[in-house]
Amino acid sequence: MGIIGKSVSLTLFALLCFTSSVFTLGVNQPGSSDPFHSLPQHLPLPPIKLPTLPPAKAPIKLPAYPPAKAPIKLPTLPPAKAPIKLPTLPPIKPPVLPPVYPPKYNKTLVAVRGVVYCKACKYAGVNNVQGAKPVKDAVVRLVCKNKKNSISETKTDKNGYFMLLAPKTVTNYDIKGCRAFLVKSPDTKCSKVSSLHDGGKGSVLKPVLKPGFSSTIMRWFKYSVYNVGPFAFEPTCPK
């Protein structure tokens, strides 16, 4: 019950007491018909002062909020499509290539060619054939150390050129053990073997790679052609 309710209750109670007192006084006044119930006269009650209530507080003004915005409706996206499953292909097998074999060389006989010169006095002692002259009938020797030591010799022509045929026991499979030597000159004034292309120690045979010249047919046999030199003799020059 609030303050106002309590005040109203007290006011009603005071009025009830006042009414009861007035009624009692009227009944028990002197000269009443009841001589035995004569009561002294009560003084009138002072006026009841009602309690002063504090002024009601002004209602609290709640802050005014702006109206809530309507919720933003997001666009409805279509359902995502299931990923396309690509077919699984079997692994690709690498192609099977035929085995590669080293080139086969037909076994042939061996022919060695070269040129022999006599150096010019200007280049005596120098490995240079500029101004040199070809030597005719110079002796060239081929030594092959294979299963059987084989030696063969030949002489140069007027152009100093020679073609030396190895023995038929020597083939192109055996040339690693073959060396060509410059042996002797018919000219006593140009007879010392020079070191040009190892003519004195033995020159290694080099195969001719030019097509059409790498082999030759002689005496019904096929020969693989190899180069050596050129070789040269040192001249005896006037001082």
From Swiss-Prot:
Keywords: Cell wall, Glycoprotein, Proteoglycan, Secreted, Signal. Its main location: secreted. Disruption phenotype: No visible phenotype under normal growth conditions, but freshly harvested seeds of mutant plants show reduced seed dormancy. It comes from Arabidopsis thaliana (Mouse-ear cress). Over-expression of AGP30 severely affects shoot development. Glycans are attached at residue 106. GO terms for biological process: regulation of root development; regulation of seed dormancy process. The keyword Ribonucleoprotein does not apply. It comes from the Eukaryota. Residues 1-24 form the signal peptide. GO terms for cellular component: extracellular region. Specifically expressed in root tips. Proteoglycan required for the timing of seed germination. May function in the abscisic acid (ABA) response. This is Non-classical arabinogalactan protein 30. The gene is AGP30. It holds the Pfam family Pollen_Ole_e_1. It is found in: Secreted, Cell wall. Belongs to the non-classical AGP family.
